[in-house]
């Protein structure tokens, strides 16, 4: 048989085999087009599970008359113009196949009007001849797409459709997914003339929690942990099922990359690993949204765009893992700190911030009520002090209603933040006792990490951790002076001491889940052989295969670094000279600043440092002119 170019209709129907799987996939493509057009409201109407009619109406920018016919042709799109655009794509669609594929297997009507046009225009296309007719029509600014009699010209495909109820279930599930990602959009869904879903815009946190309850269930919304974490160009937000409520496998598992719902094994592994020490074998529910530089992720790897490929997958995995571990750890600490207070006040009841899905509970007034929320930027391993605020994570947990009678208002936000940061054990000391100097307290403080730093505490009872202000400083009272001690500065000193204590015996390298490959230079093999002892002491395992440097193991202090850049720089450094142990320790401490740590761990580590180092750090604290403030206050009176 001779090679011939396929007719347009046949080519479009073949492409439709990947794009148009069932009515839900048609709705997915059309709604994503509406969102790319800047719509703030999308109305979906279907009949007989979508097999008879699919109608999508939006208030987006619309399509000019001159582009209507072109919009129904293959590989025609306004989303990109060059390869550079593809490598930094942020829109849902970019291949220009959806409308052409849908029109090849249905009777399609596209009506649209732009703000610049005085009237709307309507394009008709059927799958038989692919001919497009354009006629004037009445329509507001925006677009409406109707797909009638899906698969009318491909009977084999139509026979594989399930029942109307099953097809509707798939449509409803997809709408839930997009409703979680786009809280700013008003979505409605009608089936056979009846409105079954109405997701109003969720512009406030309480409104989004209400949408979360509608989509994921009341139990998930009541007990989930709020995730907010940012580090360099990575940002993670969303909700995670709490360990106390996780049981078995949850179907509420949604992961979004730059607003696009994807399936990724890395995030599933990170979530299970974060839960391992609290609930082993559990696959909890989550709604997580990862935002990163579009150049660092490839979305053009799956026909239906369900998968992505990260350029630094290990970096992304560890970022998600440590963000989740930090939030879970903070929730556990807050629960422990809150429990004694409730026991000491049997006649008091804390009003819940979340509960059943009712209008009063999720009203906007909840925004004005204090909630158990505090900034835990100190939970990250600190970098330079000027960069310290760039990495942040926050946790918010709903308070469960008490069985006791009587309500009291929650304490102020600042009080909750200071109390939530305290990791000391139960103590009857007053607030002023908590900010006294280490020489004036002997209450025990526990290390959240179980003192895994390799440092021995200088005494068996460390001082109670003082209050934390702005998530970045401890408030110290010493010799009638009030001063602020930088948590980031102390964390760097603790990290350096930890590395120094371990480096003399050699660091233990941790295997990478996915080894990193880098194009090799000619002299790297000689460097690896000559500096083998140093690399082994660093816990770094490298190999060269097929012209590539394979990074297999690194110490924990380098896990969050961009290894493809860092390791070549290390090889160049040790090629020129054999660095001293002190220089290597300093270098590792600088790289390890990307790790996350908590104020409690930093305080425990501070008390484990030698006395002379502690004094040096305390001397670097910044005094506050409280005496001058008092004089000015008294003079004003």
Swiss-Prot record:
Gene3D superfamilies listed in its UniProt record: 3.30.230.10, Histidine kinase-like ATPase, C-terminal domain (3.30.565.10), MutL, C-terminal domain, regulatory subdomain (3.30.1370.100)
Ranges for region Disordered: 343-411
Protein's UniProt name: DNA mismatch repair protein MutL
Source organism, top-level taxon: Bacteria
A GO term, aspect molecular function: ATP-dependent DNA damage sensor activity
Record's function text: This protein is involved in the repair of mismatches in DNA. It is required for dam-dependent methyl-directed DNA mismatch repair. May act as a 'molecular matchmaker', a protein that promotes the formation of a stable complex between two or more DNA-binding proteins in an ATP-dependent manner without itself being part of a final effector complex.
Comp. bias regions, Polar residues: 343-352
Entry keyword DNA repair: yes
GO cellular component: mismatch repair complex
Entry's family note: Belongs to the DNA mismatch repair MutL/HexB family.
Keywords of this entry: DNA damage, DNA repair
Positions with biased composition (Basic and acidic residues): 365-380
Annotated GO biological process: mismatch repair
One Pfam family cited in the UniProt record for this chain: HATPase_c_3
Composition bias, Low complexity: 388-397
The keyword Nucleus is assigned to this record: no
